[in-house]
């Protein structure tokens, strides 16, 4: 029982970042440095076969389908946005802030970057030039200010014309006019003598056609996903089986959002499909007493198959601090025809970014199980081709155009 409680506590702490988007962000200074130093001290990091090689697959001129954006430390130890070019070798630092970049997103049109740092929303061109201050939230001096004045969670519209961001609620910044439209106001209760966030709103990800936005509805502890339709300014809440987090993706036609959780604690593991009407289909259940179905990073491939990472734990008592995950492929229900694409599970996965065509996934793998942010970024192919190392550390990975 003690082992089970300890494991649940570790997984709960790992999940807090995705379910409490309005709390004061934890300091991330030197995260990359710590990881890099730890990796240098290790002789090997556990990862499944096949082993890495040093050349792109034959017949291709570039290793990556698009430039890869990610966070890594600068020389001063602050997290900044970097870009790895399609050759898989050339790295350029994009932001140069005197503090950590906390959240960011990349324009799908021209590769420019919108990001938050020092409670400001900023914009730079694809090469890091022409830094522009869009919103200044000012100092955060009280509990209430974090719910009413914190600038965070950025999402760029597919047409590149609008930036959705959190700032006392859900806001839209029009790049052509500079106008800001707040469509949902955070609900803060100060009657207990302290500020308690009853309900707060921030963007997660636009649907491919730009008609709707997956948003976080955050509470004092925890939160859920919901859909916001731009036409009609309509908020669609998830009803029964509301999804709380974590990594996921829209279907190409925007009819549904697949979400998955590899965590256990304040939230449950599982795999869900959020339909356009807000109805949630539970595909894999992670409720007690088990089996517990852990899942992460689902994506619907162009072949109509669902690709994700998965592990089924028969009994809750068998849980470890970090659950290993297999790369799998299945029908859209997450169950039918489910096949492991690698013979061994992956350990200590902190982040997964799929190629748009699901031909490979970039994994950020931590060198130790108690590191929960970022890691060594490496490509693992769904067809069993040799894996490819990219950069020593990456966090919050995004594709550029």
Model-derived segments and spans:
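Sec-dependent bacterial lipoprotein signal peptides
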Residues: 1-16
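Sequence signature of WD/YWTD-type beta-propeller architectures
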Residues: 18-401
């Amino acid at each position: 029982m003690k082992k089970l409680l300890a494991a649940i506590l570790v997984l709960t702490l790992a999940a807090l970042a995705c379910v409490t988007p309005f709390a004061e962000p934890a300091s991330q200074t030197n995260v990359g440095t710590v990881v890099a130093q730890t990796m240098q001290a290790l002789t090997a990091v556990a990862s499944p076969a096949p082993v890495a090689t040093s050349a792109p697959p034959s017949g291709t001129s570039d290793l990556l389908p698009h430039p890869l954006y990610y966070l890594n430390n600068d020389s001063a130890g602050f997290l900044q946005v970097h870009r790895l070019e399609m050759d898989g070798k050339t790295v350029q630092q994009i932001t140069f802030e005197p503090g950590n970049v906390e959240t960011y997103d990349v324009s799908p049109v021209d590769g420019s970057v919108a990001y938050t740092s020092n409670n400001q929303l900023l914009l730079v061109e694809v090469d890091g030039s022409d830094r522009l201050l869009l919103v200044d939230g000012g100092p955060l001096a009280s509990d209430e200010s974090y719910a009413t004045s914190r600038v965070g969670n950025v999402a760029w519209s597919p047409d590149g014309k609008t930036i959705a961001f959190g700032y006392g609620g859900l806001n839209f910044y029009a790049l052509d006019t500079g106008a800001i439209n707040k469509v949902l106001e955070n609900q803060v209760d100060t009657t207990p003598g302290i500020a308690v966030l009853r309900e707060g709103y921030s963007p997660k990800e636009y649907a491919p056609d730009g008609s709707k936005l997956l948003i976080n509805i955050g509470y004092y502890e925890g939160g859920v996903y919901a859909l916001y339709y731009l036409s009609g300014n309509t908020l669609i809440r998830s009803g029964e089986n509301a999804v709380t987090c974590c990594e996921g993706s829209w279907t190409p036609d925007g009819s549904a959002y697949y979400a998955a959780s590899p965590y256990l604690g304040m939230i449950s593991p599982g795999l869900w499909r959020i339909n356009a009407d807000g109805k949630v289909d539970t595909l894999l259940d992670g409720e007690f007493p088990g089996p517990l179905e852990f899942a992460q990073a689902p994506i619907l491939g162009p072949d109509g198959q669902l690709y994700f990472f998965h592990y089924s734990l028969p009994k809750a008592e068998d849980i470890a601090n970090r659950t290993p995950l297999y790369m799998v492929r299945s029908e859209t229900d997450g169950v039918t025809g489910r096949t492991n694409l690698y013979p061994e599970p992956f350990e200590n996965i902190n982040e997964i970014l799929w190629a748009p065509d699901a031909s490979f996934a970039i994994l950020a793998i931590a060198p130790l199980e108690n590191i929960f942010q970022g890691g060594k970024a490496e490509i693992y192919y769904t067809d069993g081709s040799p894996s490819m190392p990219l950069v020593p550390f990456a966090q919050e990975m995004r594709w550029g155009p």
